[in-house]
Amino acid sequence: MKFSKIACATVFALSSQAAIIHHAPEFNMKRDVAPAAPAAPADQAPTVPAPQEFNTAITKRSIIGIIMGILGNIPQVIQIIMSIVKAFKGNKREDIDSVVAGIIADMPFVVRAVDTAMTSVASTKRDGANDDVANAVVRLPEIVARVATGVQQSIENAKRDGVPDVGLNLVANAPRLISNVFDGVSETVQQAKRDGLEDFLDELLQRLPQLITRSAESALKDSQPVKRDAGSVALSNLIKKSIETVGIENAAQIVSERDISSLIEEYFGKA
């Protein structure tokens, strides 16, 4: 597969996650699925369950469940990013740093898409729905700010400790880093339950930057330096080129079956 297509797959992966939540709010809920009913006889018209029946088959999900659902998709995105790096044989530190900077620059658009998605979910009325999602929307800027703080502190600590090629090491050690963060999040949630805390989100927000920083420090300090070739082309330029190659219209057509073309088009329009 050409590098341009692999790079473009990363954009699809990130934008599709937000788009699926936006256009199919039920994906963001934990389903209690009943066994499928037997097929109707040929001479009998199939029955379509009423919306009320469908809604009652979906259990409400707490804010921790939503967060863990989002975190659950991170390894897949990391694998795609790892594939991009492996597919391109030469990577200079400044190339990766440039990509990281580009991701940070695009983050407001991603956050806006997630914000829109969660707002859409919050506005969807269901039996037994509570204010967990609405509260998450209100606090989204705070969540993002705290996570960004943890990531930035991890990078600063790595530079201070003389870790070579911070960007490459972050990518190469991403699975281990994510695993450590998962463990920390799980431990925090369990501790909150033992302590009888009603607002797990508060506890998680307070500890998430420290969890990320601690995990990244360990992964970067113990990692082997990632070698790079001197004559590589900037990954960021290739990613931008891949978007130009595929084009907005083709991107929208590819994902039209999920009815997320409008969001993809909006996202690519900001690229």
UniProtKB/Swiss-Prot annotation:
GO CC entries: extracellular region; host cell plasma membrane; hyphal cell wall; membrane
BP-aspect Gene Ontology terms: hemolysis in another organism; response to symbiotic bacterium; symbiont-mediated cytolysis of host cell; symbiont-mediated disruption of host mucosa; symbiont-mediated perturbation of host immune response
Superkingdom, natural source: Eukaryota
UniProt-annotated location(s): Secreted
Gene disruption: observed consequences: Impairs damaging of epithelia and induction of p-MKP1/c-Fos-mediated danger responses and cytokine secretion. Elicits a blunted type 17 immune response. Induced significantly decreased levels of cytokine/chemokine secretion by host. Fails to induce host mast cells activation.
UniProt induction comment: Expression is induced by human serum and epithelial cells. Expression is regulated by the transcription factors EFG1, BCR1, TUP1, RFG1, NRG1 and AHR1. Expression is down-regulated by minocycline. Expression is controlled by a very long promoter of at minimum 1500 bp allowing a complex network of transcription factors to contribute to the gene's regulation.
Keywords per UniProt: Cleavage on pair of basic residues, Host cell membrane, Host membrane, Membrane, Repeat, Secreted, Signal, Toxin, Transmembrane, Transmembrane helix, Virulence
Molecular-function GO terms, alphabetical: glycosaminoglycan binding; membrane destabilizing activity; toxin activity
Range of residues in the leader sequence: 1-18
PTM: Cleavage by KEX2 generates 8 peptides ECE1-I to ECE1-VIII, all terminating in Lys-Arg. Only peptide ECE1-III, called candidalysin, shows toxin activity.
Transmembrane segments: 62-82
The protein, known as: Extent of cell elongation protein 1
Species assigned in the record: Candida albicans (strain SC5314 / ATCC MYA-2876)
